[in-house]
UniProtKB/Swiss-Prot annotation:
EC main group: transferase
Xref: InterPro entries: DNA-dir_RNA_pol_omega, Pol_omega/Rpo6/RPB6, RPB6/omega-like_sf
Keywords, in A-Z order: DNA-directed RNA polymerase, Nucleotidyltransferase, Transcription, Transferase
SMART domains for this protein: RNA_pol_Rpb6 (SM01409)
Protein family per UniProt: Belongs to the RNA polymerase subunit omega family.
Subunit structure: The RNAP catalytic core consists of 2 alpha, 1 beta, 1 beta' and 1 omega subunit. When a sigma factor is associated with the core the holoenzyme is formed, which can initiate transcription.
HAMAP family: RNApol_bact_RpoZ
Protein name (record): DNA-directed RNA polymerase subunit omega
GO molecular function, one term: DNA binding
Length: 105
């Protein structure tokens, strides 16, 4: 039985079998958690979908793990700031509405 994608094709995309397994496991976990797929799949299982993405070159190992961690932290910080700003605007709107209610009475 021939596996698709073949191990040889996949090993052309990553430096080692170990790296391939780690990349596949992480991407399969992301897909299972609801990450946006990078392509249409022929497979149903997330593990095989991850291999399809690796074969297509849509998923790669980040060359600098520290830079990736810094980018993830920066994105999380930006999301936190955006959320705080949204909450501040909501509070201002509520205060404004309460002030207008006080003037009407």
């Amino acid at each position: 039985m021939m596996l698709k994608p073949s191990i040889d094709t996949l090993l052309d995309k990553v430096p080692s079998k170990y790296s391939l397994v780690i990349l596949q496991a992480k991407r399969a976990h992301e897909l299972e958690s609801g990450a946006t797929p990078t392509q249409a799949f022929t497979s149903v299982k997330p593990t095989l979908q991850a291999l399809e993405e690796i074969e297509a070159g849509n998923v790669v190992i980040h060359p600098d793990p520290e830079a990736k961690r810094a980018a993830v932290r920066a994105r999380a910080e930006a999301e936190r700031i955006a959320k705080e700003e949204e909450e501040r605007k909501i509070k201002e709107q509520i205060a404004k509405e309460k002030e207008e209610e006080g003037e009407k009475i």
